[in-house]
Amino acid sequence: MKNFKGTFTALVTPFKNGKIDFASLDKLLKQQLAGGVDGFVVNGTTGESPVLTSSEKAELFKHIRNVCGDKVVLIMGTGSNNTAQTIEDSRKAEEMGADAILVVVPYYNKPPQRGLYEHFKAVASSVKIPTILYNVPGRTITSLETGTIRDLAKVKGVVGIKEATGKIDLASEIIKACGSEFVMLSGDDGTYVEFLGVGGHGVISVASHVIPAQMVQWKKWVSEGALDKARADIAKYNDLINLLFVEANPIPVKKALQLMGILESAELRLPLVELGAENTAKLQAEMKKVGVL
């Protein structure tokens, strides 16, 4: 099994004139590999998965695998609020060569904890590759409770969770309930260093598009016992991280990547639209302040 304890970028999907912009994607992948990230999540929230067709998802994954080879871990987002569809997409991800699947809590349906357990158990049982749970109640409304996560950690194939509430007490509670072998990945960039401080293993990040080397370094410092050093360094980037979420992700990060000259366009697909002028000015000023422009 691949190592899922590391720094993973939740990749944007670059667009140009309504199509996937593979030239910009290649520039982004080159920058990310140079920054030392351990892998990528493809077809996640940041990748605008709801507006990609099945063929686009497959084309995107295959292109990234061809460019990166086995140098990085590739995790495919396959979650939906339809268990049968999630199973179908998870099997496709396995066939394409994904190292793991990332499965979000079903949204809109508002299932009870019993339903969540059965959903994730059914998905994990349908494939041989590892399953990573994804808890993000800010988008799904429904949240996985610690007891449910503990029970799912015992299901064959369920290896970890992307915990995106930003609640450090909750992260600590899950770690105690599930043990150190259960992979804990932060889904909240602003609290990442504190997450590592209570025993977290890594991150699935948006900010790593812009500051990949720094995100990698923070984990290294914490693993070496230099938590305060990591805390002091992330403090320099707090305003930047906040601005990367000033509008719905991935709106700001696409603009940031365009400003950096990595993406040709900050184009998104409706219903998302490009970052407003006022917030663009704030983002650009902060990027210059911290030295990424």
From Swiss-Prot:
It catalyses: L-aspartate 4-semialdehyde + pyruvate = (2S,4S)-4-hydroxy-2,3,4,5-tetrahydrodipicolinate + H2O + H(+). Pyruvate binds at residues 46, 204. It comes from the Bacteria. Keywords: Amino-acid biosynthesis, Cytoplasm, Diaminopimelate biosynthesis, Lyase, Lysine biosynthesis, Schiff base. One of its GO terms (biological process) is lysine biosynthetic process via diaminopimelate. The active site is at residues 134, 162. Pathway: Amino-acid biosynthesis; L-lysine biosynthesis via DAP pathway; (S)-tetrahydrodipicolinate from L-aspartate: step 3/4. Pfam families: DHDPS (PF00701). The keyword NAD does not apply. Its EC number is 4.3.3.7. Belongs to the DapA family. HAMAP family: DapA. This is 4-hydroxy-tetrahydrodipicolinate synthase. It comes from Bdellovibrio bacteriovorus (strain ATCC 15356 / DSM 50701 / NCIMB 9529 / HD100).
